Amino acid sequence: MAKGLLMTYVLWALGGPVGLHHLYLGRDSHALLWMLTLGGGGLGWLWEFWKLPSFVAQANRVQSWKQRPEEERPPLSLLRFASQIVVGVYFGLVALVSLSSMDNFYIVGLPLAVGLGVLLVAAVGNQTSDFKNTLGAAFLTSPVFYGRPIAILPISLAASITAQKHRRYKASAGSETLSVRLYRVGLAYLAFTGPLAYSTMYNTAATINYVAETLGSFLSWFSFFPLLGRLVESVLLLPCRIWWLLVGGPGFNSSRFQEWEKLYEFVDSFQDEKLQLAHQVLGVPEGATNEEIHRSYRDLVKVWHPDHNRHQTEEAQRHFLEIQAAYEVLSQPKKPRAS
């Protein structure tokens, strides 16, 4: 049955990030890739807007693949090669989070996960690659960097190079029912998300610590841009606040959800830490009036302005930026904190 361009665009708009249009076109590997990456982080989904006509045309001439000589190879695609590396690293990171506690993880689990990510991208569209050689390259590379998380990158690079070397067009296959295709895609999706969900829920403390450290490092980048930092904090805390609106207050019944509430408090505490640091920088006590804050700010700006400290420009500039950031924090209207 011929595929319609209009229907493809409708499915792209309604469920593009989860690959509905690819399922419609029979591109199951591409659909699975979009499910696991939410449309390539949204960028791949948007970029496909201009590619959909070629996807539809390709789906409608599937039978022409039979006429391709076996020795014919698809043209080299730098985009596909780069995507293989990125997705391989992504699969490796997910495996590192969810499966690193298993025995021989760096010998078996990590190269297998990275290799499968590379093969998934290699199988997008009408192309594929050699399964054994690609996984073999991943397994042969992993012992060189045994026990190091950085091994994800060289393993992905080696597997991607091998997959490109053995790229080929897919052989023609008989048509399958939609239920069979969905069953296969669903199993693959569960195989990816199941271990990750298990690790997240049953190793809550470790997950919380890791997320908290990551958020702490991330938020520290905005120390000199308080307004932008507050915006980022609001975005990070938005899911928790939506949950509170739904349940009627900041209370979680499950002990595991209480751990996530602690994460909320951790992120929310950055505002207090910034206020304390701002008071220290300006040399004013907590509860200082706006006049005291402004007076201290003017005095410090005169002292540390770079134009007045040409003999120590770098230090003066650093202090000047700290003073500006601290004043911006303290000059904002005080908001009552949630109890």
UniProtKB/Swiss-Prot annotation:
Residues 4-50 form the TM2 domain. Keywords: Chaperone, Membrane, Transmembrane, Transmembrane helix. It is found in: Membrane. It holds the Pfam family DnaJ. Residues 277-339 form the J domain. It is a multi-pass membrane protein. The keyword Chaperone applies. The chain crosses the membrane at residues 5-25, 30-50, 81-101, 105-125, 135-155, 185-205, 218-238. GO terms for cellular component: membrane. May function as a co-chaperone. This is DnaJ homolog subfamily C member 22. The gene is Dnajc22.
